[in-house]
């Protein structure tokens, strides 16, 4: 474990200053909701302090192989950025050992509770809502889909696609792009499809991608695909909006969208 950017430990005084500063900023719930529904986690489990007294350890953590989003989270919420490497094994039947790498940043205790309360209204995946409710000890209200703004839906989609999705650009005379989001939770993808259509006018397709084996049994992976083409105006405005400043947080995926937007504009 290597600490790349270290912040002081939490104290009541430091947290008071932190929360006061955060009240003066615009918390982008949809952006972090997209990340937490894909790659973020909430945990709540028993630990012991130095006096062997048990307590519930609460944590909201983001861990990725890409540094950029985790570093942004670290700086935004003043928590240390850590780099980890460890040995792990791929699932059956292609079982082999390799070195996994991840950048990690997490909020603990009072800051974890604060963050979870703020992001909960913008969580869409039921599994993540359940973990968040366990951390908080109660279930807050989710934001009604009817009340989401187009900007909120765009910001959520941007980070969800960065987390569990991909962008693929192809073609020469006609330039095309696929924005694909994957999940084994078909209801989650259905909800996103509905939001994108209602709030952004984005058309998409939802289909079965593959089945795979887990310890819990056979699961199905689904794919939500948003298609864009230089010969078809549908969805081009959506892809153009993704490359605006502050929307996407991962340059290697943003560059794919920029490639499409730049070439489609010239066509």
Question: Each predicted region: which residue ranges?
Answer:
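Internal intein/HINT superfamily modules and their associated LAGLIDADG
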Residues: 1-267
């Amino acid at each position: 474990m290597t600490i790349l950017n270290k912040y002081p430990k939490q104290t009541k005084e430091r947290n008071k200053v932190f929360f006061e500063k955060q009240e003066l900023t615009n918390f982008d719930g949809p952006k972090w909701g997209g990340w937490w529904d894909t790659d973020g986690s909430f945990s709540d489990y028993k630990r012991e302090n130095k006096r062997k007294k048990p307590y519930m350890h609460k944590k909201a953590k983001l861990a990725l192989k890409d540094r950029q989003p985790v570093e942004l989270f670290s700086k935004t919420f003043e928590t240390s950025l850590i780099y980890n490497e460890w040995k792990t094994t791929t699932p059956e039947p292609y079982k082999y050992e390799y070195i996994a790498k991840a950048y990690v940043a997490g909020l603990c205790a009072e800051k974890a509770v604060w963050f979870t309360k703020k992001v909960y209204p913008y969580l869409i995946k039921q599994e993540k809502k359940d973990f968040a409710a366990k951390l908080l000890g109660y279930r807050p209200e989710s934001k009604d889909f009817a009340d989401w703004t187009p900007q909120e839906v765009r910001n959520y989609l941007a980070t969800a696609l960065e987390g569990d999705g991909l962008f693929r650009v192809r073609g020469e005379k006609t330039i095309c792009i696929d924005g694909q989001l994957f999940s084994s939770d078909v209801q989650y993808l259905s909800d996103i499809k509905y939001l994108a259509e209602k709030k952004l006018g984005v058309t998409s397709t939802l289909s079965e991608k593959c089945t795979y084996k887990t310890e819990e049994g056979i699961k199905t992976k689904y794919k939500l695909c948003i298609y864009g083409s230089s010969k078809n105006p549908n969805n081009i405005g959506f892809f153009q909006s993704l490359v605006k400043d502050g929307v996407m947080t991962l340059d290697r995926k943003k560059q794919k969208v920029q490639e499409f937007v730049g070439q489609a504009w010239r066509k």
